[in-house]
Amino acid sequence: PFYDCHPRYSALHDIGYPSPDALKAEAEKETEKPLIAREYAHAMGNSMGNFQEYWDVIYADSSIAGAAIWDWVDQGIAKKENGVEYWAYGGDFGDQPNDENFNINGLVDPARKPHPHYYEVQYVYQPLTFKRDTYGKIHIINRDSFTDPSEYDITCDTVTFGSERVLNVYARLKTDKPWAGKGFIVAREQFVLNPYEFPSLPAKKTDGKAQVSIDGNSLTSWIVDGHEVLQGPLEPYFWKPENDNQRAAHFAERTAEWKEVKDVTVNYTIIDDHTILVEMDYLPSTADRPIIPKVGMRMRLPASYTQISYYGRGPWENYPDRKRSAFLGIYDMPLSEYETEYIRPQDNSNRCDVRWFEIGPQSSTLSPRLRIEGFQPLCIRAWDYGEMDLDAAPRHPQDIPRGRFVNLNIDLNIHGVGGIDTWGQRTLPQYTIDGNRPYHYAFMLNFCRPK
């Protein structure tokens, strides 16, 4: 029978949901027709990892004509229950059978508010790219066949953060367009001119008189200026909840043994009554460990700690395989903005390459602020709920109990979000964490007196 989509009758050769390597291999194999990925990069939930890897392949092979993301918008329907309006999906209307949240797979939510991964797509798709050569000269590459770079204002600025100096380059519209106004940033890039100098580990001493309690590898109590600053212990913690991609790939089943940390040693050095140096070592005792969801520690702070300032990648959420659009900078925001509220709750809020991080009460109170400084880049997530609340698989944000504490994860590294499909493909190997090699990291905790 005749099918207009059959390769025999089509002017294009098309495939669906390849990995970047599979896309490259298919393009090399197909020698008679242009290749397109009719659908790729399934944007469901916390997704769109490894997006740059796709376009490294596409730009390197002129026989690849392009690819189409699935999808643009989450197809949720506004619904109100008990005075709370939320985005409903399959099963919220008594419909059986249903596809649950499988239609919640866009770059923007139903109200067209961008998800964090929207900005990664915007960055990778930008028509101009900027390259810096060994002499410091910036080269502009125009990938748009119909728009000359002269239509943009190219500007740059340098920003210094301590020892680190970065150059930001922007291409802005010179005039209003039907789709954006004058000054809209069409393309941007960041170059590190002078890298950040992470501090050296201090000489260890125990002269401080901090009121602390330590149980094994866990710091269980810390009283600062008469206040207990911990609502839950600072402890080694290698588990993380799933996102939609990981749920479909049985991530929790494959990594379940990491709900209990093994082969870890933590050293706490009291510098003074407000400052503690934390060093963690993981040394595997066997060679058959599965990948690790994350390598790091967690703690719980008072629920009043809802104002955040940090120096790292942002301002939006980013993960190791989805961080190119998130530039280094100092960002200030409330906890509610630091979190990402996905329509179906899942792992969220990570920030990569954090140099320092501060969190404390919004108003001026007697409660001290916590400052964290890494001796290497950190990954940090913060929520006003716990991992167990996400592991319980709530259907909607209002199903999560909030306001009991602030949950803070301070990590060396975290598993990437993935971004090929949401029915079994796994995160690319370079964005996973090998459970069979050692890890060491360190950070300083300092509870600053309020000014």
Where is each model-derived feature located?
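Aromatic-rich peripheral "rim/lid" segments of glycoside hydrolase catalytic domains that contact
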Residues: 75-141, 179-197
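Short, hydrophobic/aromatic beta-strand segments
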Residues: 147-154, 181, 288-296
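Beta-strand/loop-rich accessory regions of lumenal/periplasmic or secreted enzymes
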Residues: 161-163, 192-451
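Terminal connector regions
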Residues: 159-201
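Conserved, mostly hydrophobic/aromatic
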Residues: 39, 67, 121, 140, ...
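Substrate-binding/catalytic cleft of secreted carbohydrate-active enzymes
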Residues: 1-107
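Short, intrinsically disordered, charge-balanced linker/junction segments flanking boundaries
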Residues: 1-6, 126, 130, 145-160, ...
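Beta-strand-rich binding/interaction modules
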Residues: 134-173
